[in-house]
């Protein structure tokens, strides 16, 4: 990835991106467990406390295995494609049983993920928070009205696929000095930009008014995190 410095002052570097406590380390966004080696240069990082960093680790490994099982429709580690997932299962064999118990099986035999899976939602919320912080945007709606839509095999639904890549226009400008505003100035238009962290593995897009975050994982799973408009129910 291209290096994207930030010049704003609205987000102190010593405040944890996730809990608001003292940040004594940094966290990669996305977590490396969702990427494959060799990693690209200039991976995005955000300030984080060690407690949050460690607490998210097990859930992230679980989600990485969950996504691999459902994407490939198998629980056989010998059929897994991602080396990182294979290593997780070798190190923690019991994780496969945990994943299998949490996966839903459809009438046609296909496996699918429960979108209300608590561990999945926790990790997705973390990713959304990290992307908002990295772009220098407000995270307040995460605590007051976040809705997460989770989709599988997005390429099979043309309408959904177009929705993901449709531009998110905004009438509001991001904070001065933020990465989001710098990208806007370079592009010359007030719409969000897609950033590819690793081709075929992870890309994301953040609305300039911080109202929405879109993520595509493994070129298969789609995530939309957005504000809930309580006025419309």
What are these regions (language model features)?
Residues 84-122:
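Short flanking/linker segments adjacent to small metal-binding domains or redox-active Cys/His motifs
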Residues 1-15:
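Short, charged surface segments at domain edges that flank catalytic/cofactor-binding sites
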Residues 49:
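Zinc-coordinating Cys/His ligand positions in small cysteine/histidine-rich zinc-finger domains
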Residues 54-90:
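Polybasic, low-complexity binding patches
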Residues 114-233:
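C-terminal, charged low-complexity interaction regions
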Residues 15-45, 56, 61-62:
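Histidine-centered nuclease catalytic patch
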